[in-house]
Amino acid sequence: MKKQPSIFGGACIIASVCVGAGMLGLPTSGAGAWTIWSAVAICLTMVVMTLSGWLLLEAYSTYDLRASFSTVTKDMLGSTINAINNLAVYFVGGILLYAYTTASGGIIENLIKPWIDLGSSGLAICSTIFVLVFSYFVWHSTRIVDRISVLLIVFMGITFVISIYGLAANISLDTLFDIGGKEGDYAKYAIGMFPVALTSFGYHHSVSSMRAYYGEEQKAKYAILGGTGIALTLYLIWVFVIFGNLPRDQFAPIWESDGNLDVLLNSLGNVIESNTVKQMINAFSIAAILSSFIGVGLGVFDYLADFFKFDDSKIGRTKSWIVTFFPPLIMSILFPLGFLKAIGYAGAVATIWTCIIPALLVYKSRKRHNTTEFRVGGGNGLIIFTVLFGVFVAIVHFLAMFNYLPSFKG
């Protein structure tokens, strides 16, 4: 009898998709809102993103287990909406892979620079090596991604605990709550945090993979909840210990670099005395990027395989691998962009397929099928709220992009 996949394994895949972006982007994007309001924004986003993932599961439940986001959207909403959704999914998945590739190349280059100086080509070389080595797991199979994700989550857990222990020992409550800060109006900055927070829970392109993996909706539902729950817990602890160590006004150079990870790590290193803690934070950050790179890569890989109708043979998977990983790598080499800026763009576009499309799919599905075995509670109220949340986040990003929202610069 074939062994059933564990819910924990699926939760680790979902968490691994989420954690990279959040760990790297949330502290900087939340610097204006600071501790309390950052926590409010992160928690609200987690709840909405979990429910919208469940809405997708409900929409999928009347289709074959191999049916993908693209297949269901085309059948329910038509070719035009599906084309828009396809572009949005690929844009977000691609820009996340691009951001992780660029960030990883920069970290690897800095790590080896004391021994090997690759000069002006260092970032491109390190980014290419990173992609060629770690995209292999996605090419191989979902099962190996499951196993690697579990190993990475365990490794992240160990390095996270050591990092948090070291950082927590030096937390200053005055720093954590910005006592005596020059500016005490935090709430106005919380709105601008939502695009990054939404991207931090953007696992939805992996929902069809989870359903196919388990062969049912109920286990996939719990895997999604477990994954977003793991991500939320890690995010809150991570943000709190960073805000408790790194004063609010010291985020200025991080903002100036558009939230680049190496600048954040260097800033943290300047306030941490223990070399062991510094090394653990670096190791944790690399594992967070790698886990998210693999998780996002799996979702985009399966999505494009269905879109282009590539089969599951080695040749077919190689074609899927090329269209998944090569375009982001080429863009990373030619146009390296600030990490936080890239994540913000991803968040704005992700509202289409994390909020708006799932709600519309369920609305159409319920009109077509009066009853289904798997059904999310909340009625039309949840559908409307999910759409409004997505529209709100998209508007926030574009207002911030044109400087119509308060922007904290340290």
Q: What is each PLM-predicted segment?
A:
Residues 9-18, 86, 111-141, 155-163, ...:
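Transmembrane alpha-helical segments of multi-pass small-molecule transport proteins
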Residues 51-62, 66-117, 282-306:
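Hydrophobic transmembrane alpha-helices that form the core helical bundles
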